[in-house]
Amino acid sequence: DCIINWPTTWQASIRLGQKLVSEGVIGKVYRFQFRNPDSLGPFSYGQVMTDRQLGKEWWHQEAAGGGSMLDYCCYGTILSNWYLGEKPLGVYGLKANFNHRFGDAEDYASLMVRYPEAVSILEGTWNTVSSGYDSGPIVWGEKGALIVENGGDHGIHANVSVYHDRYSTTPNEVYSSDDYPLPAGRSNLAEEVFHHLETGEPLHATMDLNNNLWSAAMLDAGLRSSRSL
């Protein structure tokens, strides 16, 4: 088996959000949005490095696979496909380097993805001092909107809020991820792999190789598209 691990797979709030969407809490979905939480990019929170030193790191070199699109938009691709339950038809990519001019890789990127019945907007940035609002997933449907709160500490104790009323800033329903914990015996990577090997049951959808190949294809299409500007 080829197994792909994502930190977001182990956030109960993200799984809860997908569960509610699949149950039709906000009706037919037409838009999905996700961006990474606060980040100023690689090496921003440890030992201080000069611009010259940072520029020599592969993270900031496009030819080496650096840049915020591959670093952070990847999370959005796997989550978007999972939440929407569809495969994409096309991807439009945009990238720019606003604050990390010592390298040629982008520090901001976005993907707009077209699905048969929906769209998704996925962002990856190394320029966010403070998000200002929850980075999601945020999902819009015919009956309202759903917001997965970040909750700090990688989504632990986070809520999922559902809005049904027009112009309302107060959610109609609030679900605590504490009430919907990860499955017993499958709450981390090791347990999930052991469970799969012992029972033969499929891995979580976000860890499936085929699903991740679709994510890779979306990123590749986004990179190619961004170079056409």
Task: Identify the residue ranges that each predicted region occupies.
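An acidic site on a long C-lobe helix of protein kinase domains
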Residues: C2, T9, S13, K28, ...
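Predominantly a Rossmann-like dinucleotide-binding segment in NAD(P)-dependent oxidoreductases
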Residues: I3, T8-F102, L229
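A general structural signal for well-ordered alpha-helical segments in protein cores
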Residues: S13-I14, G76-T77, R186-F194, A216-L219
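Short glycine/proline-rich turn/loop motifs
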Residues: W59-Q61, P171-Y175, H196-E201
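Active-site rim elements
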Residues: A64-M69, F98, S176-L182, E201-L209
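Acidic/polar loop patches that form or flank catalytic/metal-binding clefts of enzymes
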Residues: E86-G93, V119-I121, A145-E149, H204-A205
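NAD(P)-dinucleotide binding in Rossmann-like oxidoreductases
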Residues: H100-N188
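C-terminal helix-rich "cap/oligomerization" subdomain common to oxidoreductases
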Residues: E192-L229
